[in-house]
Amino acid sequence: MTQIPTIKQVRAFTLKGGGADYHDQSDGHWIDDHIATPMAKYPEYRQSRRSFGINVLGTLVVEIEDSAGRVGFAVTTGGEPAAYIVEKHLARFLEGARVTDIERIWDQMYLSTLYYGRKGIVINTISGVDLALWDLLGKVRGEPVHQLLGGAVRDELQFYATGARPDLAQKMGFIGGKMPLHHGPAEGEEGLRRNLQELATMRERVGPDFWLMLDCWMSLDVNYATRLAQGAQAHGLKWIEEALPPDDYWGYAALRKNVPTGMLVTTGEHEATRWGFRQLLEMGCCDIIQPDVGWCGGITELLKISALADAHQALVIPHGSSVYSYHFVATRHNSPFAEFLMMAPKADEVVPMFHPQLLGEPVPVNGRMRLSALDRPGFGVELNPECALHRPYTH
């Protein structure tokens, strides 16, 4: 019987400048434009998301080294606070354990942090550790993560694009384009009119058949979201995304009943764990859930979330996440397409989503990605050695 390697050391680093913390961009990037946010009710924080601190945490890099010297790693958001949690709390549950003990390790990390965790940065941190474990296991076995998850159910992934220019995404071969909502309730009737005019203009550019979606980033209330959805029906809006704060399950249930027939309600980017998604699904809050594998609990938890969604006949279209979601989507029948974040400053070209932090990160070609692009062991990417890592804590 082959001896299973054990985990020798866990290390946590911080990294600034784009990558997993994709809001950490230079001036002029579309992602930091005048975009509706919960903070847009305050005029001084309306023009830029960085103005209220969306980029303060930075990227967390987790490395896990096994007894044979192999290293699995993953990136997510969380920065220095998350690095502290890894080094000072979570590392004890990994070091000395077998690299295959992923389920037990996840359970211990989650239960041991319940009194200060459950959601937010703690679950981000657990997600990063979990993803690094899956990367390591893939390297130990010489297999890509999608094979560890039971194997692919499709030979090719298809993508919609999130960015400021769905019309350009259409020309690049994507199946749809999701654009940020620019004006929230605090900007009144004129803001609502401008939102609908921007959607109408984009519909004119892309024609009647290309998917158009609106990303509202938690910024609306039920009344405004209902009026927006009703006004957007004339312009063929496919879905309205994350219209309400993530804890307003009751509002989502009401909104789903209010939107025009055929329009989808989606959310879940900022939800976490099977329990949070159980609430969304059992209350009938949405048609599509959008967990971020780097924020919801990692691959281990996303498998449970996906099974719950499947039982409720809901699609699972993970938020962003690059290779971490690609390997998952390839293996799930209820994830028929994936999201690609257009991280070029003007959303006018396809660039790796977590650039410059990862090397070997695949990108869609004509809106699609062959499974062969995901055939390397683990998640198939490496850290860029030119990106300076900082280890703020040790244990």
UniProtKB/Swiss-Prot annotation:
Site (Increases basicity of active site His): 292
Highest taxon above the source species: Bacteria
Necessary cofactors: Mg(2+)
Protein EC: 4.2.1.90
Residues at the site labelled Transition state stabilizer: 339
Anything else known: Reaction proceeds via a syn dehydration.
Family classification: Belongs to the mandelate racemase/muconate lactonizing enzyme family. RhamD subfamily.
Quaternary context: Homooctamer; tetramer of dimers.
EC supergroup of this enzyme: lyase
PROSITE patterns: MR_MLE_1 (PS00908)
Catalytic activity as recorded in UniProt: L-rhamnonate = 2-dehydro-3-deoxy-L-rhamnonate + H2O
Annotated residues for binding of substrate: 23, 49, 339
Active site: 319 (proton acceptor)
Described purpose of this protein according to its UniProt entry: Catalyzes the dehydration of L-rhamnonate to 2-keto-3-deoxy-L-rhamnonate (KDR).
Cofactor binding note of this UniProt entry: Binds 1 Mg(2+) ion per subunit.
InterPro entries, sorted: Enolase-like_C_sf, Enolase-like_N, Enolase_C-like, L-Rhamnon_dehydrat, Mandel_Rmase/mucon_lact_enz_CS, Mandelate_racemase_C, Mandelate_racemase_N_dom, RHMD-like
Species whose genome carries this gene: Delftia acidovorans (strain DSM 14801 / SPH-1)
Keywords tagged on the record: Lyase, Magnesium, Metal-binding
Protein name as it appears in the record: L-rhamnonate dehydratase
NCBIfam families per record: PRK15440.1
